[in-house]
């Protein structure tokens, strides 16, 4: 796994070098590469570009099953994908604002001076403080004001996480319903998984591999290329 970092182009080149070091020549006849995600245009050696929706849906089918609702909370957007018969039936996407994404939690954890895991641990013991702004910039200003007023950090942490989870639950609740599957980096945040299940009224299923659902789906799609 190669972190994207600032430049998708640099990450793409590092990945090509890592593949070569592992014995995979991207130009070889028996090697196929699929690019997906926001950096997909920065992979010149890709044999095909496939949408995130398709790749996450395919990966979720492999990890969980062929029907249900996939919730992917990424760094730049949140996706809700309905699966039927192992295929994507419909989807919804929030890519207009970071306030309902993992990036929002990262920003707020930085503002609180703690890691995302520490924020989740603190939130368990906190009372929810309402974060009402729908915009990341304004929400950050709210958090700064709360800190200035001496609001306990655990309460702010609870409010921040609840604000994200409630937005995600609203999106997911408009889909087909349970079973719900969580993919993306937030699947490793046990508190987020629990709170999302509480708001949806149904357990949210995930797995240690769920953060790689998009990559898994892309690999499966690559296997099918001639």
Residue ranges and their predicted role:
Residues 1-4, 23-54, 82, 89-90:
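Short beta-strand-loop/turn "lid" adjacent to the catalytic site in phosphate-handling enzymes
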Residues 85-131, 135, 220:
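Glycine-rich phosphate-binding loop plus the immediately following alpha-helix
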Residues 16-31, 168-179:
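Phosphate/pyrophosphate-binding loops at sites that engage ATP/ADP/AMP, CoA/4′-phosphopantetheine
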Residues 38, 172-199, 210-214:
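Glycine-rich phosphate-binding loops at beta-strand->alpha-helix junctions
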Residues 67-84:
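Gly/Thr-rich phosphate-binding beta-strand-loop-beta motif of the actin/hexokinase/Hsp70
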Residues 102-106, 207-226:
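Glycine-rich phosphate-binding/hydrolytic loop that grips phosphoryl groups
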Residues 1-18, 89-96:
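Short glycine-rich, Thr/Ser-proximal phosphate-binding strand/loop in the N-terminal lobe
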Residues 139-173, 211:
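Adenine-nucleotide phosphate-binding core of ATP-dependent small-molecule kinases
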